[in-house]
Amino acid sequence: MDHSAHMGMSTHMGMSDMNHSTTMPPSHHHPTSSGSHESMMMPMTFYFGFKKVEVLFAGLVINTAGEMAGAFVAVFLLAMFYEGLKIAREGLLRKSQVSIRYNSMPVPGPNGTILMETHKTVGQQMLSFPHLLQTVLHIIQVVISYFLMLIFMTYNGYLCIAVAAGAGTGYFLFSWKKAVVVDITEHCH
């Protein structure tokens, strides 16, 4: 299916016909575009630029190298925070599940002996503060993950690098504390 008429491009346009020195995202406007936001299409290839880069919201547009540097740092820190939040949630979950109590009680045994019987009590409730906190943190984590995905989907190379580098740095800084849990019921070690 030929879509070249939709984008005002010739099917004979080759790599030598493209302007590689631009700092703007690839133009994907319809030929009859009046510059309205509805007629703009998302870039479908990676590009390295800092002019007219729209990030998350219509009013949040990067137009200078300084703004791109600031956006890079902000996205990098957001990706780091996301990784830290994942590890922090695991730690909170582990702490909230430590509320397991063992109760021992004497019971009569054979030949008149007394044995100690131990019962395990797990105290988890749906309407508890730890569960509500986990729910709020989960919502925050989901929103941040979608923001990072949408930032990556701008196809701006600088912002994509910021997401990947921030996530990698966050994992490096926070995941070493991650507990290694071995499932004793797993038979494929």
From Swiss-Prot:
Proteolytic cleavage, leading to a truncated form, is facilitated by SLC31A2 and initiated preferentially by CTSL and to a minor extend by CTSB in endolysosomal compartments. A post-CTSL/cathepsin L processing occurs to yield to the fully truncated form. The modification Phosphothreonine is found at residue 113. Residues 15-36 are annotated as: Disordered. The keyword Aminoacyl-tRNA synthetase does not apply. Residues 89-131, 177-189 are cytoplasmic. A motif (Methionine segments (Mets) motif) lies at residues 13-18. Residues 1-67, 153-155 are extracellular. GO terms for cellular component: apical plasma membrane; basolateral plasma membrane; early endosome membrane; intercalated disc; late endosome membrane; plasma membrane; recycling endosome membrane. It catalyses: Ag(+)(out) = Ag(+)(in); Cu(+)(out) = Cu(+)(in). It is found in: Cell membrane; Early endosome membrane; Recycling endosome membrane; Apical cell membrane. The keyword Magnesium does not apply. The modification Cysteine sulfenic acid (-SOH) is found at residue 188. Residues 20-36 have a biased composition (Low complexity). The chain crosses the membrane at residues 68-88, 132-152, 156-176. It is a multi-pass membrane protein. Keywords: Cell membrane, Copper, Copper transport, Disulfide bond, Endosome, Ion transport, Membrane, Oxidation, Phosphoprotein, Transmembrane, Transmembrane helix, Transport. InterPro entries: Cop_transporter (IPR007274). The record marks 41-42 as: Cleavage. GO terms for molecular function: copper ion binding; copper ion transmembrane transporter activity; identical protein binding; silver ion transmembrane transporter activity; xenobiotic transmembrane transporter activity. Pfam families: Ctr (PF04145). It comes from the Eukaryota. One of its GO terms (biological process) is establishment of localization in cell. Belongs to the copper transporter (Ctr) (TC 1.A.56) family. SLC31A subfamily. Homotrimer; is stabilized by cisplatin via interactions between cisplatin and the methionine-rich clusters, and could be crucial for the copper(2+) reduction process and copper(1+) stabilization. Heterotrimer between SLC31A1, CCS and SOD1; this heterotrimer is copper(1+)-mediated and its maintenance is regulated through SOD1 activation. Interacts with KDR; this interaction is induced upon VEGFA stimulation leading to SLC31A1 and KDR subsequent co-internalization to early endosomes, thereby activating KDR downstream signaling in endothelial cells. The C-terminal domain mediates copper(1+) binding and is involved in the copper(1+)-dependent-ATOX1 interaction. The C-terminal domain appears to act to limit transport through the pore by regulating the rate of exit of copper ions at the intracellular side. The N-terminal domain can collect copper(2+) from copper(2+) carriers in blood. The N-terminal domain, in the trimeric arrangement, tunes its reactivity with copper, promoting copper(2+) reduction and copper(1+) stabilization. The Mets motif is involved in copper(1+) binding. This is High affinity copper uptake protein 1. It comes from Sus scrofa (Pig).
